C-alpha cells in the first residue's frame, strides 16, 4: 500500500501494480500479474489494519484531507503513484489519477464523523454492468447513437454513494371500541345491525434500516431511484473496498433528515397496525398509538454504476444508473428527434397513401 500524506493507493505485493476490488469474486486483483488477494491477505501484506481514527483537535476538513485548497471549492492532491496533481471537489473521497489511471483514496476525508461505518461492496462488475446497459438500451427507441457510442460508454463509472441508515424499535398499540356493521335486505326494507367490540392490539417490531441518500448535490438523483439496497449485505467499512471505484462523502447530517425519517417510520407502523384493524369501522389512530424508541444512526456507502450525458446545445442532463448490488436499472434518456420525425413520416406514408389510393378507385 502506497500512502502519501492522506492519499492511499493499494499496490500488488508481487509486482507493485495497482489493486482493485473485484465484485465477481469479492477479492482484490492485480491487472498486471493477475494475482488475487483476500481482504485478510491484503491487510497482512500491507502490515496495517484499519481502525476508526478521529480528526485531531481543531483540524479542519481540508487539513484532515491532506490537500491544498484551490479556487471554486476544489482541492489539489498529489497522486501517490506518479505525483500528478489531481483536483477534486470537497465531497469526493476516491477518484482516479488522470495520468496513471490508478485509484487514489483520499483517506483524510474519511476520519472521525466522515468515516463510514459500513459498506455494501459491488456485486456487479463493469463487464456485467455494460451487458445490462446494452440490454436495457436495446429495448428503447429513438435514443441518439451518441448516448451509447464507445466514447460515451467508456464514461460508465462505479461510484460508492453515501447513505445514512436509521434503525429503531417501534411499539404499536390500540385499546378502543370498534364497530362491525352488517346489512340485510328484505323486499323494500333494509336491516342494519351494528355490533360494538372492544379492540386491543399491541406489538413491537424493529425497523431494519431506513436509508436516505446523504448528498445535497445535484448528483444525488443518480443514486435515489436505484434503491432499495439489501442492508443484510452490509460489511464493516474498509478503505480497500474503494479500490477501482469512485466514492463520495456525505454532506448531510442526521439532524437535517431526522424529522422526515421519523414520519416515514410512523407511517410504516401505522399502515401495519391499520391492516390488523381493517375489519372494524370507526377506529382512528393518532401519534399516541405509535412509540418510536432506541433510534440509532449509521453511515454506509452503497454501490451504483452510473453514466451521464449532456445533450448538445442543451443544459439538460440525462443519466443511466444501475444498482451495483441488485442490478435494478433507472434512467432518463434523450430522444433523437430526427429519428422520431422520420418514423412518424413513415407511419403517415404507410397509412395515408394506401387509403388515398383506395379512395381513388372507390370514389
Can you name each region flagged by the protein language model?
Residues 302-333:
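Extended, hydrophilic extramembrane loops/domains of integral membrane proteins
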Residues 21-22, 39-40, 88-89, 106-107:
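Short, non-ligating residues that shape and space the ligands of small metal-coordination modules
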Residues 16-18, 36, 84-85, 103:
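Cys/His-rich metal-chelating microdomains
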Residues 7-9, 25-27, 72-76, 94:
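Residues immediately within or flanking Cys/His clusters that coordinate Zn2+
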Residues 114-314:
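Charged, low-complexity helical/coil segments in non-catalytic cytosolic or luminal regions
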Residues 354-363:
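Juxtamembrane boundary at the C-terminal end of a transmembrane helix
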Residues 12-15, 30-33, 79-82, 97-100:
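Short cysteine-rich clusters marking metal-coordination/redox-active sites
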Residues 333-344:
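Juxtamembrane/start-of-transmembrane alpha-helix segments at the extracytoplasmic/lumenal side
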